[in-house]
């Protein structure tokens, strides 16, 4: 069958634990959700009302059908998409849907503030082309995000 709700790669670990009938350790915070109740018993709702991503320079949130991405490298930039109307993220609404942008920024700020600080500093900050395979040559004007490692 097909499960059409949004999930996150962090759900895999929790789902494996659930399939093995192993309780999640209380001493470790696990962000993922066990997907088995949603898949096997048709549990109502969805595993995540909101999804977050964060690294040192790039952060994103999906809430309801809106996605906000923001990056600080090489320059500060924001992207806002209505995923219901624009699933391929072609129309950046960041300068139009200001109330939604403000709400998602506040939610993302709160989430980022709740995260533990990195244990080790990043060693590399490399440019990655947006919507272009790494096998294609970089052209002046190509859109980039910077990915830390």
Specify the residue positions occupied by each region the protein language model found.
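Polar, surface-exposed loop/tail segments
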Residues: 1-61, 120-125
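Short beta-strand micro-motifs enriched in acidic
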Residues: 69-73
């Amino acid at each position: 069958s097909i499960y059409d709700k949004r999930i996150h790669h962090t759900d895999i670990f929790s789902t494996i634990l659930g399939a093995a009938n192993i309780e999640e350790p209380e001493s470790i915070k696990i962000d993922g959700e066990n997907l088995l109740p949603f898949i096997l018993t048709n549990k109502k709702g969805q595993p995540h009302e909101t999804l977050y991503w964060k690294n040192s320079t790039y952060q994103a949130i999906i809430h309801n059908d809106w996605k906000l991405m923001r990056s600080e490298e090489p320059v500060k930039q924001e992207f806002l998409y209505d995923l219901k109307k624009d699933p391929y993220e072609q129309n950046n609404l960041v300068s139009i849907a200001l109330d939604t942008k403000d709400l998602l920024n506040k939610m993302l700020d709160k989430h980022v503030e709740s995260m533990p600080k990195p244990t080790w500093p990043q060693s590399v900050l490399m440019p990655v082309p947006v919507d272009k395979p790494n096998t294609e040559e970089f052209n002046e004007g190509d859109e980039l995000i910077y990915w830390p490692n």
